[in-house]
Amino acid sequence: MDQPRKLHIKSFGCQMNVYDAQRMVDALAPEGFVETQSADDADLVILNTCHIREKAAEKVYSELGKLRLLKQDAASHGRRFEIAVAGCVAQAEGAEIIRRQPAVDVVVGPQSYHHLPELLEKARRDGRALETEFPIEDKFGVLPPPRPDAIRARGVSAFVTVQEGCDKFCSFCVVPYTRGAEMSRPVAKILDDVKRLIDNGVREITLIGQNVNAYHGEGPDDRPWTLGALLRHLASVPGVARLRYSTSHPLDVDDELIAAHRELPGLMPFVHLPVQSGSDAILAAMNRRHSADDYRRVIDRFRQADPSIAFSSDFIVGFPGETDRDFEATLALVTQIGYAGAYSFKYSPRPGTPAAELQEMVAPAVMDQRLEQLQGLIDSQQAAFNRASIGTTVDVLFERAARHPGQIVGRTAYLQPAHVMAADDIVGQVLPVTIHSLERYSLIGELVKPQPARPPKPLPVTTGA
């Protein structure tokens, strides 16, 4: 019997890439590959790349330089070592990756992961393989389903892609060019995925997409369903304890999604809703197609539906033309909304996007100062949100053993890590925890002990006449 070959995938960026990495593992399992956590002992390394953040391509080339040395060492010992570049940098850079780093065997875009086995075979035969086209077939329909043992090994929370691509064309963003137009999967296929996960121990499902609330997949009634309708359908699946979704666009928040938050107990009250800036002038330059007040009104609709709801967001500082007044508007928005957490980034131009042609660049030192100030405000809000948990009892889905012996870690409805001392048989259960302290960004608490059942009241004693 052939020895299994070892596969290591290093993922950068978004939740979609985490999911895609799992699907690549599933696609290569029938070829005899098993996953390893180290590139050093791998036979195939895949860099699963993201093109959103600063210097994304250069980070990939830096990683490839390290992998080239591993490939040379493997060759000196008579061992085959293969390198593949996947994801959005692969889609954007294409053949340039192989030109700059000839050690690369395969370059594959996000829509072609189901072709990985054939691409590896082609690379072994011809020396290189490149596929960055947008194939006609739905990759989700041809990727093999994950094996039961793989699902169980990945834990009690799982991602399910329901939508991919984006039609919004924000001026700074490469996603429409690297992931293509919006595509939604049929409800029936999503339901099959969810049931398979639940049957193998998953308790929490996160529906993901580049613009997930633009979901419009075909329902059982042959009509397009919204994300709200899909969530309602999945909430009725036995065994689904929690539902989440990410990432959303303010323009696509509709009445059905708001109603789902009002009516579905299993839909977690935590929404990632990027806004990018609090300045209307900058939002217009970003082609966001909404104002800061439009965003505030969307937040208000969510809070009216569920007062317990909390938010995270994304912000870009230093977008071309951003003035001090524009930045102050962003700080004002953050102060008014009050976030449980958020991510902030310095603007960096993405080649091929409209914003890359803008000339009014903000000085790097100003960007640094604004980023520090904004992230400081966000961090203070997150700390206050976490402190408010002390003394309360919250439901926690327990996921795994923690680093400290005897400690189990799970997550609250707001994705806060929560640690308790307990036996590991609570993994996979949602249990109440009383929070008594914080440790950095984690909550520390104790399981609420079940109350003993009260004995029945004795019947009144009666005497005969």
Curated annotation (Swiss-Prot):
[4Fe-4S] cluster 2 binds at residues 166, 170, 173. Belongs to the methylthiotransferase family. MiaB subfamily. Residues 5-125 form the MTTase N-terminal domain. Residues 387-449 form the TRAM domain. It comes from Rhodopseudomonas palustris (strain BisA53). The keyword Transcription regulation does not apply. This is tRNA-2-methylthio-N(6)-dimethylallyladenosine synthase. One of its GO terms (molecular function) is 4 iron, 4 sulfur cluster binding. It catalyses: N(6)-dimethylallyladenosine(37) in tRNA + (sulfur carrier)-SH + AH2 + 2 S-adenosyl-L-methionine = 2-methylsulfanyl-N(6)-dimethylallyladenosine(37) in tRNA + (sulfur carrier)-H + 5'-deoxyadenosine + L-methionine + A + S-adenosyl-L-homocysteine + 2 H(+). Its EC number is 2.8.4.3. It is an enzyme of class 2 (transferase).
